[in-house]
Amino acid sequence: MWGSYTKVSLIESQEPIALSRPVVPPKPNTSALRRVLRRARDGFALNIDEAVVAMTARGEDLADLCASAARVRDVGLETAGRRGADGRLPITYSRKVFIPVTHLCRDSCHYCTFVTAPDMLRTQGAGMYLEPNEILNLARRGSELGCKEALFTLGDRPEDRWAQARDWLAERGYDSTLSYLRAMAIRVLEETGLLPHLNPGVMSWSELSRLKPVAPSMGMMLETTSRRLFETKGLAHYGSLDKDPTVRLRVLTDAGRLSIPFTTGLLVGIGETLAERADTLHEIRKSNKEFGHVQEVIVQNFRAKEHTAMAAVPDARIEDYLATVAVARLVLGPAMRIQAPPNLVSREECLALVTAGVDDWGGVSPLTPDHVNPERPWPALHELAAVTAEAGYTLVQRLTAQPKYVQAGAAWIDPRVRGHVVALADPVTGLARDVNPVGMPWQEPDDVESAGRMDINTAIDTEGRNTEARSDLDSAFGDWESIRAHVHELADCAPERIDTDVLAALRSAERDPAGCTDDEYLALATADGPALEAVTALADSLRRDVVGDDVTFVVNRNINFTNICYTGCRFCAFAQRKGDTDAYSLSREEVAERAWEAHVQGATEVCMQGGIDPELPVTGYVDLVRAVKTRVPSMHVHAFSPMEIANGVAKSGFSIREWLISLREAGLDTIPGTAAEILDDEVRWVLTKGKLPTSMWIEIVTTAHEVGLRSSSTMMYGHVDGPRHWVAHLQVLRDIQDRTGGFTEFVPLPFVHQNSPLYLAGAARPGPTHRDNRAVHALARIMLHGRISHIQTSWVKLGVERTQAMLNGGANDLGGTLMEETISRMAGSEYGSAKTVAELIAIAEGIGRTARQRTTTYALRGA
């Protein structure tokens, strides 16, 4: 022990449970251990079986294992260019204030003393949550002591379990613990300058995205991937919903998709087997390999605590702990920061941890105790520096986000906290400067000014792209090997076409187009040859019955107001990094001027969409709508995909409904149902790194319909998808339309592959075949019969002849004149970016049909 704090217990006594020793290492197989130790000496990463064997090392074998791990650690520090002021390699720490926002939780982990109940809090004279002034007082005192980090720790969703928590939040105007956490993080930034590191437990994609603008980093211990500990009565995680390994792995993945610098780790000695422990490490490695977001891995030893169900369980043995730390280093590699809490071991054990490959001590506070382990005081910083020096390293202070993320800028750190980070970061190393934090406004970036390649809307047709790909192609999209593995998994599920099934499905569809089974729709989607001709003929007949022979179009202008985006959609060739030669942004004045130009040319609609630029102010979307409506009051504003709406919601802290209403009140008329791609997450997470999940797309679109904002619907196909995904996607759209009736049309969007990163990486097909195009348009007409009357085809992506084929196979609408189009053109489409009214009329007349101009919502013009 390094010292002691007076412990005040806030927890209720729990009945002890009989647990065996957490880990009983199997008797090592000598030859297997020798082989693994040799591979470790040679610098090889260990697979799961090898990791299990390595964790049995003891005595001289353990020393050998630790020496190999230490060499790997040192190579990583050398490669990163890290040195202390004295020239020695550094071991880092974060000087922090521990802020226990609430000790309430909906879970009941058997080893936890942090969590308590409302009655116990009252007995201690404590509130359900720390009040704002309590949080700020802690943060201010920490700032005075040179702390840079405010560690917000709390139980999972206490309001779900405790009425007292719900009441406390409601009395103060908050609808959830996470809303309160967000507000307090902002106040700490503004009033003290400390950098929040948020540990609120399990969160959804949307919750993570709402918190990213208020914190440079977040964390959640994976703890273990053992389902046995979660599902078996009496074991450590039984009865704790949020300790489901599947759920926790999903959080880890979502953090990666959102490019959040993320801390995770494992607990050693809570009843897991060595195989389960090794699997936990490999799952962390797998997630980090795909996204590169795991900034540090905590390897934490179990310490039994009084008044818990696991009070009688022995602490993790030091040899077992050291072996696990060394294996973590060998599994996770030289670039990973491996962290061990120095307060959970003795001084001598700290020295041993350094020899095992540790290079980070985590957060250490000169002010507050470790509220999760209150019986284990932090070492004084001078003591920690001394033991680090004795081990041959220099103790160096870092920020809550590790240096490589600090230095990467907007790709990882939201602009709203970027200024706070820069104020505390050494500009050369990304480590902490020797300054005390000072509060500064948490504010929106300045209004967007026109910048970059503003003429790309016209130059794309004459000059093309300046570059083949964005500048961060190698890092923006995650690990391509992992992505290709996901694609192979999807390909293994492709259906087999059987002609007799197609004919039977066709007969069923002729009787009741909207009433077929999924298997029958799948058969129609795989039709080819004469069967495909019959399917498209049925679709064309349905089109004629529903909307007649008129081919409709709208006179509109696309205005893509920026192509700067860090979302990481792997199919997208439009997105650019700020500073790339093809990157641009348009000011609201420029957007309004383009809307006026469109109005003069007869346009009734502008369609506005853009990249997810982290520097776009939260008011940016509303400002764009108002700018257009002010310049051209009669213009129909069709704008902002569900992804853009999700971005606005995350930045503003509003609910989806509140945000959509604010856009509607500013003048927004309808929204495009883009960003759908394929509404199946197993496909979406291959197509895109960070775009919103299917469930949130559905929530945003249905909410838009409910507040009076109708939308189009779309599906992008021909990449890593297959017919079963088309059927499932259309079923989702049918379900939404049954609930809301808010879709105006369905637009199949063929994947344009030429410049797509996903295609260039060898992970996607070269777009759909002509058979695919015909089958998708026909299937849409059949499946959406009686629900969505209008099926649009894209002349931009298909060209004139294939567009005409779609009009003869179920489609009835040509979309718009567009006037400018950069998304498909930057992807490699060769069919131009604008059509005149005369050219659209000619497309229809070329197949003996009449073209009619319409409004956005399909009222005929001049009728």
UniProtKB/Swiss-Prot annotation:
Residues of the Radical SAM core domain: 91-343, 551-792
Reactions it catalyzes: 5-amino-6-(D-ribitylamino)uracil + L-tyrosine + S-adenosyl-L-methionine = 5-amino-5-(4-hydroxybenzyl)-6-(D-ribitylimino)-5,6-dihydrouracil + 2-iminoacetate + 5'-deoxyadenosine + L-methionine + H(+); 5-amino-5-(4-hydroxybenzyl)-6-(D-ribitylimino)-5,6-dihydrouracil + S-adenosyl-L-methionine = 7,8-didemethyl-8-hydroxy-5-deazariboflavin + 5'-deoxyadenosine + L-methionine + NH4(+) + H(+)
Keyword terms, alphabetized: 4Fe-4S, Iron, Iron-sulfur, Lyase, Metal-binding, S-adenosyl-L-methionine, Transferase
Annotated positions binding [4Fe-4S] cluster 2: C565, C569, C572
SMART domains (UniProt xref): Elp3 (SM00729)
Organism annotation: Mycobacterium leprae (strain TN)
Region described as CofH-like: 528-861
Pathway: Cofactor biosynthesis; coenzyme F0 biosynthesis
Matches recorded under Gene3D superfamilies: Aldolase class I
Entry cofactors: [4Fe-4S] cluster
Gene: fbiC
Residue ranges, annotated region (CofG-like): 92-424
Free-text function comment from the UniProt entry: Catalyzes the radical-mediated synthesis of 7,8-didemethyl-8-hydroxy-5-deazariboflavin (FO) from 5-amino-6-(D-ribitylamino)uracil and L-tyrosine.
UniProt-listed Enzyme Commission number(s): 4.3.1.32, 2.5.1.147
Keyword Cytoplasm: no
Family note: In the N-terminal section; belongs to the radical SAM superfamily. CofG family. In the C-terminal section; belongs to the radical SAM superfamily. CofH family.
Name this protein carries in UniProt: FO synthase
